[in-house]
A protein has these predicted regions:
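Hydrophobic membrane-insertion alpha-helices, especially the h-region
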Residues: 2-21
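Second-shell loop/turn segments in exported
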Residues: 78-85, 107-113, 129-135, 178-186, ...
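Juxtamembrane proline-rich low-complexity "stalk" or linker regions positioned immediately after a signal peptide
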Residues: 25-56
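Glycine-rich beta-to-alpha active-site loop
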Residues: 117, 126-167
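STAS-typified acidic loop motif
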Residues: 34, 58-92
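Extracytoplasmic/secreted envelope proteins and their assembly/folding machinery
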Residues: 90-97, 118-122, 126, 143, ...
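Charged, glycine-interspersed solvent-exposed loop segments at helix/strand-loop junctions
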Residues: 169-261
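Surface-exposed patches in mature extracellular/periplasmic domains of secreted proteins
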Residues: 104-110, 133-137, 155-158, 205-215, ...
Length: 264
């Protein structure tokens, strides 16, 4: 949920995969060990997913999740969501859907949040047959929203982040946060199969599901467009205006955006 380093990681991933010409795959077999964690400064670019551990993270849900900002495009067809999946997220989404009957797409930037609100929102997205596009990053519970969509899109420089859901609630000093953490853990245990089912329906293979289960809750495994493609995830790459980009167009988009930084 706490992804302060996402911006730098996004840049590293896309430069390594497209401009530097390096592959960004996740091993060759489900039993292959995961890559070593990258440093928190993002100084190295591994050939697999980038594993980040925000400084001060302790494996607990100790940081309170804020509520995302919602806005609707002038034509009423696109809902823009930016921020955490907080307590009000599902209710805010339902309100936006009810007020905008012609919504077709959600464009989201989120580091994740609470399982209960997120899973409820994923169900709403599924029922409305919405398309979900990732802008910049979508991690933790946000990936469930993306996977549950009728169609998935990613902007070329976007990443998704996976990690497990087991958290150390007992280390929290604040009683309210501890109760909230324990409730989320119980809720997640009861609904884990739904989350995994959505990921599988989106094309996540056993290798990626293993990555999600093996990455500790206080870390995040970031995957870019090439890594997701190579592992069979079903999505389209589009530019910020929604135009489809093939592999060569994606490469050119990133060259134009980032120049030659990191190419050598």
């Amino acid at each position: 949920m706490v992804l302060k380093l996402l911006g730098a990681a996004v840049c590293l991933l896309v430069l390594a995969a497209y401009i530097g010409g390096r592959k960004s795959s996740v091993g060759t077999s489900a039993s292959e060990p995961l890559p070593a964690s990258a440093s928190s400064t993002g100084a190295a670019v591994p050939s697999g997913p980038v594993i980040l551990k925000p400084q001060g993270a302790d494996g607990s849900a100790s940081v309170r999740v804020g509520d995302a900002k919602f806005s609707v495009s002038p034509d009423g067809r696109t809902l823009f969501v930016e921020g955490g999946i907080g307590r009000r997220f599902s209710a805010d989404l339902e309100q936006a859907l009810a007020a905008n009957a012609f919504l077709q797409r959600i464009v989201i930037t989120s580091g994740g949040g609470y399982a209960g609100s997120g899973l409820d929102a994923a169900g709403s997205i599924r029922r409305r047959n919405l398309t979900v596009r990732v802008r910049s990053h979508c991690a933790s519970m946000c990936v469930g929203l993306w996977a549950s969509a009728a169609a998935r899109e990613m902007e070329p420089d976007a990443v998704i982040g996976l990690h497990q859901w087991r958290v150390a609630c007992d280390v929290l000093a604040d009683a309210e946060q501890r109760r909230e953490c324990e409730y989320s853990a119980q809720f997640w245990t009861a609904h884990e199969k739904s989350y995994e089912g959505w990921l599988r329906s989106a094309g996540f293979n056993d290798r990626l599901l293993q990555l999600q289960k093996q990455t500790p809750a206080d870390q995040v495994a970031l995957l870019n467009v090439p890594a997701l493609r190579e592992n069979g995830v079903d999505f389209r790459v589009v530019d910020p205006d929604g135009h489809y980009l093939n592999r060569e167009q994606t490469r050119r988009f990133l060259l134009n955006k980032y120049g030659r930084r990191g190419a050598d």
